[in-house]
Amino acid sequence: MNCVCRLVLVVLSLWPDRVVAPGPPAGSPRVSSDPRADLDSAVLLTRSLLADTRQLAAQMRDKFPADGDHNLDSLPTLAMSAGTLGSLQLPGVLTRLRVDLMSYFRHVQWLRRAAGPSLKTLEPELGALQARLERLLRRLQLLMSRLALPQAAPDQPAVPLGPPASAWGSIRAAHAILGGLHLTLDWAVRGLLLLKTRL
């Protein structure tokens, strides 16, 4: 009897795939993610970036006081208002938010390259702001993928931004970029929180 058992074990060992259940396919398993948790993560990143932007804008006002509105024609126009919150749809919000934030990302890059010596004292803060913007952009792209939403159209080639005409021009541009980004992020937090209730 022992000989028979040993013989059976030897035979079975020659074909392990016949007796061992197949394991998971190669590669990382696809874990289904809760869309509400993904949206929560995007909201937290947006709030954090909003706080950073508000703080940096306050530093700008302290170091370089400048009354009045500061505009930059190349910046995106705020697409939404309080009156349109009720009609928001998730695909449109995420797509527009990603496009607008990509524009601000490029403007911050430009500001770091083109700004004169006057803004060099804010270089660490501008660098951190750019890194957080990039992180939020990746999160939004992931969220759109997880929710199986239509992906944004390929980004159009960015129009090169010319250097500021003067040191004052770079300061005005910084005020405009930070002010516009602050408004966009403030709207984004409100819109994303409202859309979360509809998931």
UniProtKB/Swiss-Prot annotation:
GO MF annotations in UniProt: cytokine activity; growth factor activity; interleukin-11 receptor binding
Subcellular location: Secreted
Spans annotated as Important for interaction with IL11RA and for the stimulation of cell proliferation: 182-190
One family name in Pfam for this protein: IL11
GO biological process, one term: negative regulation of hormone secretion
Keyword terms of this UniProt record: Cytokine, Growth factor, Secreted, Signal
Region forming the signal peptide: 1-21
Similarity-based family: Belongs to the IL-6 superfamily.
Subunit structure: Interacts with IL11RA to associate with IL6ST, giving rise to a multimeric signaling complex.
Protein name according to UniProt: Interleukin-11
Gene symbol of the encoding locus: Il11
